[in-house]
Amino acid sequence: MRVKTLGAVVLVFFGVIKLSDGALFAGDAMPAWQVTWEKTVAAAKKEGKLNFYVGRYGSEPLLNEFRKEFPAIKLVTVNGAGNTLGTRIITEIRSGTVVADLFSGGANTNYDILYQGKALDSIKTTLILPEVLDESKWYEGKHRYTDPEQRHIFVYIANPSSSGFYYNTNLVNPKEFKSYWDLVAPKWKGKYVSQEPTSTGLGGGLQFMYYHPELGPEFIKRLFGDLQPTLGRDRRQITDWLAQGRYALCVGCRETTRAKSQGLPVDELDNVDWKEGLELTTGGGSMSLIKGGPNPNAAKVFVNWFLSRRGQIALQKYNDLYGEDAPNSRRMDIPKDMLVATNRMIPGKRYFDVSDPKYADMTPMFNLVKEIMKAREQIKE
């Protein structure tokens, strides 16, 4: 009896050892997910390529980690502003030539341009690895999709403590601000510069302003109407204007971290203790699968790698394409100590998550902004 037991142990031992090489015994078959994964990787290697249209989180150091793991898949990136890339994808689809396999950018571009343009397949069906499928590893114990069907637009970032309002440190005392309403005090009339508010680049900030129960449409009217900000399409240029002291405050400036490191007098207002709480934003961190993309298996491999612990740790290691600090992943089972303090979620703090699907419709807020802009033009006339 002792010999039989020992033999069983030996069989089990060798069964485990041979799992990666193929089953020796009937009970040693690979789990279904692993069979699917290995077939997908093999098919991706045959495709040999992945076309990735990506915004700010397409830095080479980050993507090189994927290239090291899957050298047989040539990762080709097209970088640019989210709305520009989204429009390009739609144009390519309508011309009959689908080039992009995956898109990563702002949730608003994903929803307003690609989802509404019926350009997306279900990214949910590409998830294979158990560690990616396990929703308990993610913020609030669930995957976040911003589309109504909960399957097309996967949000992988939850960035807190970003007010989106920047200031010239020589002209503004940040201690003046205890609430968002302090930003629209009459004293700031004519002292703002802002990104053009009708573009999707300000979408996350506009969602927060519009849908927050303590702010709403009245706040937007005061900001873009009463205060009469100067508008610009080039976000680097408006950052330069802020640094030069032409304006005291800015909405939607970009590359301020880099400018600050160069000794320029710019910084972002810290809203960590403001009355209305903190915005939780995707910060350009949502991903979608393009319908009819030429390399569907390579796309599946990348999605699973990127959403795995390895991929999301890599995401948190590197600054984005604009030099801004690495973002906070919605994965909660990975270290957060490499993040700057302002990008870490604070236990007990109040967060307003704009990636909730009920806030996805941008139409009412953009209509409001267009009305404000029209009224401004009429005043000039």
Which residues are covered by each model-predicted region?
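Short, low-complexity disordered leader/linker segments with a strong preference
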Residues: 1-47, 379-381
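Conserved C-terminal helix/tail region of periplasmic/extracytoplasmic solute-binding proteins
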Residues: 27, 33, 345-381
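Short, polar/charged alpha-helical segment
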Residues: 34-45, 49-51, 55-74, 260
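Bilobed periplasmic-binding protein-like "clamshell/Venus-flytrap" ligand-binding domains
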Residues: 49-52, 154, 193, 308-319
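Extracytoplasmic ligand-binding site segments that recognize negatively charged/polar headgroups
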Residues: 53-64, 76-90, 98-246, 261
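Non-transmembrane alpha-helical segments in soluble domains
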Residues: 90, 111, 115, 181-184, ...
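Periplasmic-binding protein-like
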Residues: 220-225, 229-232, 236, 265-293, ...
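Mature extracytoplasmic/periplasmic domains
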Residues: 285-354
